Amino acid sequence: MNIIGVILVIFFAVQIAVKSGLSRIEQQPYKVLAVFRQFEIRNYPESLIAQTVCTGNKYKAVARTGFNKVAGFIFGKNSAGKRIPMTAPVRIEFGSEFSRVEFVMPLAYSASTLPKSIDASVQIKTWPGGNYAAIRFGGFPNDQKIRKAIEALEAELTVSGISFKDEPVYLGYNPPYQIMFRRNEVIIPVEWKSAE
C-alpha cells in the first residue's frame, strides 16, 4: 500500500472514531410526530439552556464568539469551577442585529443544581420547547447553506399547509474537526395538532 493509501485509511478511521465518539454525547431529546418527504415535525420538551447574545447575524462570527463564551461556562468558568458535559446540538438563533448561541444543558441538571455563570454575558434560561419542523443538511455550515435550508423548509411547510413562525433556529451537531458524516439542521416553530 502506498503512502496515500495509508493516509486515507488513517483519515477514514479517525472520522469513523469521531462519529462513534459523538454518539455518546447527550443530545437534546425530541419526539418525532410526523415525517414528510423533506422534513419532519418534532416535539421538544422544555429544556435548560446556557445562552449568550452576540452582535451580528453572520454564522462564522456568531458561532465563534458565542461558542467560546458558552463553552467557557461548561468548561469550568462557573460558580462551582467544574466541567459540565457537552451536549448536542449547539443552537443559533439569528436575528437582524443580534443572534443567540445556546447550549442545551444535560438532563441531569435542574435550574437549582446547575452552577451559575461567572461571565455575565452567559445566562441560564428555560427554553419552553414546543412543536418544530426540522430539515437536515450535511457538510460544513455557512450562511448560504443555512439560508437555503430555511427557504426550503419554509417552502415545504407552505406547500403542506402547515402554519409556522419565521423564527428559524440552526442546530449544529458536530465539532469542527469532524469532516465526514456531518449533521446540521434548521428548525422552525409550527402549529401542529397531533392525532394522538
Predicted features and spans:
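A solvent-exposed interaction/effector surface
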Residues: 1-196
